[in-house]
Amino acid sequence: MDKLEIKTDSFNVITKSIAAGNVLSRNINGYLGKFKDPETGSYITADFMTQFGVLEDFNLPNEGDIVSKDNGKVIADSCEIRLYYDDVVGDSTALMHLKMYELSKPVTDAAALYTNSNDIESDYLRSGGFEVEKAYTLADLTTDAKEKAEKNYSPSIKISMNKPYTDKDGVTYKNYGTYLLQKYYSKPSDFSNSYTLINNVIPGFYFKSVGGSGSIGRVFNTIMFVYFRIQYNGKVYNRIASFSGTQEVLQATHIVNDQQALQQLINQNSGTYLKTPAGIFTEMTLPVDNIVAGHEKDSINSAKITLQRINNVSTSPYALQAPKQVLMIPKDSIQTFFAHHNIMNYKNSFVANFSQNGYTFNNISSLIRSMYENKKNGTASADWNKVVIVPVTTTSMTIQNGSYSSTYSTGVYNDMSVRSVKLLGGNTPLKISVIYSKFK
């Protein structure tokens, strides 16, 4: 009878910090504001663009039932956009200023969706389009305590859209909501799905931080509300039409970082960094040849490595939290992974959560074997044995089938929140623990 032989070994892993560079910022959230990084002393600025979508069965009441009218034409009583936010970094009471710009056309250029790109500002803002400036605080000081105490309260930045609006055809409306209502009743098919809405009615809006500093917030939902009245059975009722910036439509964040300040951290060798948004990644060189040497015909059952956090000694009241999730991806695959909307497969891409003061990848043996085979077959790139640790956010979907449920990953995105962690490594190699097996 064959006997299973188990062996273990460990190997050094070299790590270093690298500049994140220009990363794909398409995400399910937007980020807005300006904040001074306590680690670098430099400012991070975040602006974002969003489109708006509708449900497939979107419809409005019969035009004849609308009470809100002017000279026989349907009008909106009012219109506003609300930026619903959470995950505030910095001083929530800091006075901030934003400017909202209407887009002239839907964003279609993939290059415009990267953090360093100014293409949206240079190529997509409508000249003479709808613009609104707004002062705000992320403490939501304009909402009274009674409303904040309500169960369904969610803080938001409220942007009025009630001034006259002139569309691209030169037609002027009472407000932006009136434009939407009259467009709907003249051609309801333009509101039949998000694609037609974006291409024919609302290309999108860009929200730019133009004043103040001290905070950045995560905008997890952007909703446009159109308020009007209808008459039914002799009574008048208030009604709302809403259009949402959700994960089904395009959202992207533009980031301004101080690259020189980031480079000073990259040059440190006392550890490595992960900094978001679009700041610093950690690169690992895996000792593939050493791991496989003498075990070419053995099974590699597991290869485990932990990236341990160096505790933050900052005394700043706004010390940054560590990224919640990180992706391990081959260095030569990082650009295509995000551009092609791939998700982790736990064969050559892995996600780990921040837990017990670090990130643990329990088994990357399939990646080790794949790298070795690529080199052996002559298909390896110059970075064949290098991986990059990238802070990410993920989305998932749960499907219920009777008493059973299954959860599936639906998206992996570059983390655009303001987070930072210093990890063991650099001058001090990490250890990867390997378990082999073979039959004798």
Model regions and ranges:
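Secreted, disulfide-rich extracellular signaling modules
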Residues: 1-440
